[in-house]
From Swiss-Prot:
Coiled coil: none
Protein name, as recorded: Retinoic acid receptor gamma-B
Pfam families: Hormone_recep, zf-C4
Spans through the membrane: none
Superkingdom, taxonomy of origin: Eukaryota
Organism placement in taxonomy: Eukaryota, Metazoa, Chordata, Craniata, Vertebrata
Compositionally biased intervals (Basic and acidic residues): 470-489
Length: 489
């Protein structure tokens, strides 16, 4: 058995060996196939999956700012500098700044002290090599890079109603105020060389022309759409408040800068000295200055007419009965002037607000004119023409000749009593109401009354118990002329 086992054992042990070798050989042959498949799969998968982005490069490190040693943001105008010193140098060059050192012109410039002395900071900018030409070239480059936007002017068209309004106002202005080219100019040698307090000859001529101008202004007002629909009281209030504004505006549009003269409606041409001697006095230079300010506006007759209408129809005047109606009439005038002015000057949209600003200037001149009228009344020998007196002077400065009389009527004396005006103010300060204002009601038409009775102010057209007009109420000159001569309806 042992021999059999001994003989059998090697056979049994040997038999599997070839199989294992064969398997190993087969395995060795098969290995490259496996490797190539894996490699092919890996390659195809790499092609399908995108590769991850490469890491960003490290930030670029610049040398500290050559001027203040702060952290640099790059090379600006030739040197490494921070944003602060870059902007400071650019502004200094572009605006041609001139700085002053309050010490010895050798201040230390660093991150902390750089804002203390601009002179030394700019000097150090030049010392470290910043280039002035680089600033200018950079500025020109930006101008070339920026595309110029073509801004087309807005199209302004008047509606049918506004077009009709403009035509009516323009026609009313032209028919009551001839243009300078339509006048035959003539001059006078009266006191043309030196200023005097008052030239009576020029004053007589000027007062005559002013009265005619006032009549033309009333005629102009009547032609404005909607003006005669206002109450008579409001028409008179607006005329008295704006008459001097329109008068000054009209005469200033006839200013000739080459000769420094102004021309009136009949062609009379006066220089600055003659205007002073004719009664303008200290108001002369103010009027001529305003006339010079109108020249750049280059207003035509239509714009002058619209601006005159805006001055006249203004709801902020005192003692108006229906200010809201006046405002309603003014709104289309403002809109018409805005559209007309911008349509006439599409590239100058600021002209309309500049025109409106002249209304404020005119009111200032009118206030000075009313003050001048008071002193002028004391200089002229005779009475002032009634229309001029009514337009230029505040009716409250006139005194009644007597506080009361038997008939109950009080006559108005057309002369200002400055002393009495001071007494009135003193009485108000003491809390005492003067006799002439006792019983006065707020909101009444006291501004248009001319008579007083028993120390009580009465309304101009207030009826008594029998329904008739009270005997003591005399019509003012403006009221009578407005209703009769000019037929204000």
């Amino acid at each position: 058995m042992r021999d059999v086992f001994r003989e059998a054992t090697p056979m049994t042990c040997r038999s599997p060996l070839p199989d294992l070798r064969d398997m190993m050989e087969k395995l060795t042959v098969f290995e490259p196939t496996i490797d190539s498949t894996v490699e092919t799969q890996s390659t195809s998968s790499e092609e399908m999956i995108p590769s991850s982005p490469s890491p960003p490069p490290p930030p670029r490190v610049y040398k500290p700012c050559f001027v203040c040693q702060d952290k640099s943001s790059g090379y600006h105008y030739g040197v490494s500098s921070c944003e602060g010193c870059k902007g400071f140098f650019r502004r200094s060059i572009q605006k041609n700044m001139v700085y002053t050192c309050h010490r010895d012109k050798n201040c230390q410039i660093n991150k902390v002290t750089r804002n203390r002395c601009q002179y030394c900071r700019l000097r150090k900018c030049f010392e470290v090599g910043m280039s002035k030409e680089a600033v200018r070239n950079d500025r020109n480059k930006k101008k070339k890079d920026v595309k110029e936007e073509v801004v087309l002017p807005e199209s302004y068209e008047l509606s049918g109603e506004l077009e009709e309004l403009v035509n009516k106002v323009s026609k009313a202005h032209r028919e009551t105020f001839p243009s300078l080219c339509q006048l035959g100019k003539y001059t006078t040698n009266s006191s043309a060389d030196h200023r005097v307090q008052l030239d009576l000859g020029l004053w007589d001529k000027f007062s005559e022309l002013s009265t005619k101008c006032i009549i033309k202004i009333v005629e102009f007002a009547k032609r404005l759409p909607g003006f005669t629909s206002l109450t008579i009281a409001d028409q008179i209030t607006l005329l008295k408040s704006a008459c001097l504004d329109i008068l000054m505006l009209r005469i200033c549009t006839r200013y000739t800068p080459e000769q420094d003269t102004m021309t009136f409606s009949d062609g009379l041409t006066l220089n600055r000295t003659q205007m002073h001697n004719a009664g303008f006095g200290p108001l002369t230079d103010l009027v001529f200055a305003f006339a010079g300010q109108l020249l750049p506006l280059e207003m035509d007759d239509t714009e002058t007419g619209l601006l005159s209408a805006i001055c006249l129809i203004c709801g902020d005047r005192m003692d108006l009965e229906e200010p809201h109606r006046v405002d309603q009439l003014q709104e289309p005038l403002l809109e018409a002037l805005k559209i007309y002015a911008r349509r006439r000057r599409p590239n100058k949209p600021h002209m309309f607000p500049r025109m409106l600003m002249k209304v404020t200037d005119l009111r200032g001149i009118s206030t000075k004119g009313a003050e001048r009228a008071i002193t002028l009344k004391m200089e002229i020998p005779g009475p002032m023409p009634p229309l001029i007196r009514e337009m230029l002077e505040n009716p409250e400065i006139f005194e009644d000749s007597s506080d009361s009389n038997d008939s109950g009527a009080a006559a108005v004396v057309p002369a200002p009593n400055i002393k009495r005006m001071g007494q009135r103010q003193a009485a108000w300060v003491k809390g005492e109401r003067p006799e002439w204002v006792r019983g006065r009601r707020r909101g009444s038409k006291s501004r248009y009354k001319a008579g007083f009775k028993a120390g009580k102010a009465r309304s101009r057209d207030s009826p008594d118990n029998n329904g008739e007009i009270r005997q003591g109420d005399e019509r003012s000159e403006m009221s009578v002329r407005a209703e009769q001569d000019f037929a204000l309806e």
